[in-house]
């Protein structure tokens, strides 16, 4: 008799929630259905948007006979890495001028986080540092915990961030938790458009956060997935990152170009490394090269070429910033419209937090039972946390979504 399959005891894993939500949405035959769960931009017709500048650059690449499909270097396309880091740090960054910045092209922002996490687990503040505490915000993007756990970190903690009662930032709780963190702990910070809350610290609050982190010797690991996409302004969305440079921090910054270029399936990311001196950066990159070699070995070229071509050409760059502002402005408009409708309906509670928040997501304050009601009774798909993708709202579905939220809040406590 043949032995059972070697995979017979493998348990069925739980599906990734946000993708299951989209699958459920697709299978729903109800014509009223609305998908507010997907983490991607949608037009007012609820369609994905290929940025006009991206179409233009893709055509340019297709017609360039000098390009080929040879392997890129392990660390990625040099021009892309340089342009990406410059976008985060600014043209006049002292770190760039002093040549103490490095970049690693990665498979999206997740890949940048993972390469950074793997490096820190091996080399941060010595060797084999898997017991170093890693702090993530409460709440945070669910993959943060998973990535650092997979890299081997054994002590992942949360710092307070969201005040559910006032529906805003719990600054004092955040500062207290960082103040009490062991020295040299790693702290994951959302550079802008905090996911899932959409609530960001002000510049003054960032200064307080930096002050605590500096005297506790905490290591910042920025996640910058929405530069330009949050406020429509590239500089404003990078303010925190640039302030930390000015304060002399060494840090990592995981960058994603999925949202601000609409290149979701090209997996275009960059890990920017800021150190104290050029020689240290070279050593760090030499070790990261070893990590990349056993992870994906060489990154893909197409998305990196699109981003590098755009960022390095003044005319294309200007067109791109216009495209990004188009997306950011539509989201801001949808926020205002949703809030106005809920207030007009006299929906119980306060709704100013919808317009106080920025970026793609809004943390509505809806509880899991209300979310369940919206999914099952109204065919409006959103995460159990109450997070919605604001770009899933359109001029055609706004009234339906607002009245449905009103109904859920009124009927379900």
Swiss-Prot record:
Modified sites of kind Phosphoserine: 149
Catalytic reactions on record: L-aspartate + 2-oxoglutarate = oxaloacetate + L-glutamate; L-cysteine + 2-oxoglutarate = 2-oxo-3-sulfanylpropanoate + L-glutamate; (2S)-2-aminobutanoate + 2-oxoglutarate = 2-oxobutanoate + L-glutamate; 3-sulfino-L-alanine + 2-oxoglutarate = 3-sulfinopyruvate + L-glutamate
Keyword field: Amino-acid biosynthesis, Aminotransferase, Cytoplasm, Phosphoprotein, Pyridoxal phosphate, Transferase
Cofactor list: pyridoxal 5'-phosphate
GO CC annotation, single: cytosol
Misc: In eukaryotes there are cytoplasmic, mitochondrial and chloroplastic isozymes.
Record note on quaternary structure: Homodimer.
Name by which UniProt lists this protein: Aspartate aminotransferase, cytoplasmic
Gene: GOT1
């Amino acid at each position: 008799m043949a032995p059972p399959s070697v995979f017979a005891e493998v348990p069925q894993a739980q599906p990734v929630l946000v993708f299951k939500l989209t699958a459920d949405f697709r299978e729903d035959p109800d014509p009223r259905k609305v998908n507010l769960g997907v983490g991607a931009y949608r037009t007012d017709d609820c369609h994905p948007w290929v940025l006009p500048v991206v179409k233009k650059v893709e055509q340019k690449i297709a017609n360039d006979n000098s390009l080929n499909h040879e392997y890129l270097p392990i660390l990625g396309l040099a021009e892309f890495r340089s342009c990406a880091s410059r976008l985060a740090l600014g043209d006049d960054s002292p770190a760039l001028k002093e040549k103490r910045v490095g970049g690693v092209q990665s498979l999206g922002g997740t890949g940048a986080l993972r390469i950074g996490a793997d490096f820190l687990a091996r080399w941060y503040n010595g060797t084999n540092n898997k017991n170093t505490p890693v702090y993530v915000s409460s709440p945070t993007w669910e993959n943060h915990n998973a990535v650092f756990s997979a890299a081997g970190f054994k002590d992942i903690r949360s710092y307070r961030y969201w005040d559910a009662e006032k529906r805003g930032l719990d600054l004092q709780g955040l500062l207290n938790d960082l103040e009490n963190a062991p020295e040299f702990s790693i702290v994951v910070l959302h550079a802008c458009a905090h996911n899932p809350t959409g609530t960001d610290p002000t510049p003054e609050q960032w200064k307080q956060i930096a002050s605590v982190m500096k005297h506790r010797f905490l290591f910042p690991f920025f996640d910058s997935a929405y530069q330009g996409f949050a406020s429509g302004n590239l500089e404003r969305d990078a303010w925190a990152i640039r302030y930390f440079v000015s304060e002399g921090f060494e840090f990592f910054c995981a960058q994603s170009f999925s949202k601000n270029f609409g290149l979701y399936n090209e997996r275009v990311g960059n890990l920017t490394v800021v150190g104290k001196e050029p020689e240290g950066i070279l050593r760090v990159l030499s070790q990261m090269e070893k990590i990349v070699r056993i992870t994906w070995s060489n990154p893909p070229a197409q998305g990196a070429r699109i981003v590098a071509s755009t960022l390095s050409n003044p005319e294309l760059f200007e067109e791109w910033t216009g495209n990004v502002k188009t997306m950011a402005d539509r989201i801001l408009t949808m926020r205002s419209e949703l809030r106005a409708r809920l207030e007009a309906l006299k929906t119980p509670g306060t709704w100013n937090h919808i317009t106080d928040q920025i970026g793609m997501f809004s943390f509505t304050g809806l509880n899991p039972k209300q979310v369940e009601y919206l999914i099952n009774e109204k065919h409006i798909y959103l995460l159990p946390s109450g997070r919605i993708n604001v770009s899933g709202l359109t001029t055609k579905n706004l009234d339906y979504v607002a009245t449905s939220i009103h109904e859920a809040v009124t009927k379900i406590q």
